[in-house]
Structures are given as C-alpha cells and as structure tokens.
C-alpha cells in the first residue's frame, strides 16, 4: 500500500500492526466490537491512520486513542471482551497481542487489488472475528495458518 501523504513511501506491515493494535485498544476502552471502530473510521480514515502510523506509534497510545475517539465520534457500548468464564481462562490476550493476530490475518488474506484498509474492513467484518474475540475459546492463539484457513472456511470446524 502506498502512503497517501508520501507517495514515494510504502505503508509497512508494522504500520498495519500499529493500527490494528489501536483498533483493539479503543474497542476495549469503549466496550465495542473491533468492527465498530473499523467501520466508524471507514476506509479513508484507515488509509490516513495507516499512512501516519510510523509517526503515531511514537505518541502516547492514550493520547492517540483519545484523538481517534473524539475525532470520529466513537461511542461507548456494552461489548466487553474481558468478561470471560474463569472455568475456561483466567486471563485475556493484550491489545498488542490481538493487534498482531489481526494484522497477520489481514496480510495472509489480502486479495489482489486490496490495500491494507480494504483488508482491515473485510477481515474485521468477517463472522470468524466473533470466534477469535471470544476468549473463552482458544481461537485467538491458534497459529496464523490455522486462522487463515479458518477464515477462508468460515469456521474453525
């Protein structure tokens, strides 16, 4: 993907990882599904964030989250990924870990003609994300190739 502000630069996988991490962080803070954040930002804003990620990652993540929440009118909800059954797990993955999971899934399923923003919208709106984000299951820590295969199959079965 070409940087929209600096056409001679490419957006890197690390830039994608940062934006996926911020999506996860903001979604958790607002108690919203990840796809709410991605869909509310939209394709153009995602392209902007991806193009600025190499600079934004140096800022305080709380300040970046605040700017995105205020700038795009993101609202709190009731979706809380941290509510897990203690019989199944006693911890949840960090926002950085889930940012890595989702950035890998975007890259591994990127289709011809798509940029990272298109891939993010497609992946975060796929039903498989409801399973990945259910931390009572083990889906989120499956190897990348298993997540990719499950994405294309539409389930983990």
Residue ranges of model-derived segments:
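Long, compositionally biased
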Residues: 1, 54-90, 94
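Intrinsically disordered, low-complexity linkers and terminal tails enriched in Pro/Gly
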Residues: 1-2, 157
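A structured, charge-rich N-terminal accessory region that forms the first stable segment of a protein
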Residues: 6, 10-13, 88-110, 119-132
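N-terminal interaction modules that seed assembly of large macromolecular complexes
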Residues: 6-67
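Short, surface-exposed acidic
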Residues: 31-39, 76-81, 112-117
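Amphipathic alpha-helical interaction surfaces
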Residues: 47, 51, 67-78, 104-111
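Glycine-rich, aromatic-bearing surface loops/beta-hairpins
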Residues: 124-157
């Amino acid at each position: 993907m070409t940087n929209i502000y600096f056409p001679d630069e490419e957006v890197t996988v690390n830039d994608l990882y940062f934006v996926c991490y911020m999506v996860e962080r903001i979604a958790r803070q607002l108690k919203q599904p990840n796809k709410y954040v991605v869909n509310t930002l939209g394709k153009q804003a995602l392209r902007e964030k991806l193009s600025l990620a190499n600079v934004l990652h140096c800022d305080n993540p709380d300040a970046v989250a605040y700017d995105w929440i205020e700038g795009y009118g993101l609202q709190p909800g009731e979706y809380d990924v941290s509510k897990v059954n203690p019989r199944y797990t006693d911890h949840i993955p960090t926002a950085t870990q889930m940012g890595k999971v989702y950035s890998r899934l975007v890259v591994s399923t990127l289709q011809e003609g798509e940029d990272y923003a298109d891939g993010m919208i497609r992946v975060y709106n796929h039903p498989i994300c409801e399973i990945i984000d259910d931390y009572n299951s083990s889906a989120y820590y499956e190897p990348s190739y298993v997540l990719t295969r499950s994405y294309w199959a539409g389930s983990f079965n």
